[in-house]
Amino acid sequence: ALLYEGAALAVLVVLLFLRNARATFVAATALPLAVIPTFMVMHLMGFTINVVTLLSLSLVVGVLVDDAIVEIENIMRHLEMGKTPYQAAMEAADEIGLAVIATTFTLISVFLPTAFMVGVAGKFFVQFGWTAAIAVFFSLVVARMLTPMMSAYILKPRVSRGLPRWIEIYLG
């Protein structure tokens, strides 16, 4: 239930941030596309779905959507510049690619060492570290391969609408 709640909140925040249902759909699609292969690799490694692996997935659910959000936000910026969806997706993905890759491998380097802890705690954290690292890696694969492609076909050209009135009031 915690995984579903985290996913629903992540999608809601994306919708509020991007204010575009199509872009939210692309970002929301990234979540299952990263989690399903994670479950497959967990099965190959002999892991079960337990409290530790679900905790790991619950912690990284925001990260799983984050890579796609970064890509989509940059694509939306290019769309507001008047580019076609295909052109915006390709140029935005090229612009932001290295940053997304660097962020992902930084997160992997944070989570993966927990898989190599020794002792009693290490027995529990093996599945935690591997599950988090694998999920974050598949998030990168989805963000770099599928998000730009889906954006090129699903998003529509748009003009900049500016900030919502309540944000302008808040910022002064």
Over which residues does each language-model region extend?
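Hydrophobic regular secondary-structure detector
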Residues: 1-172
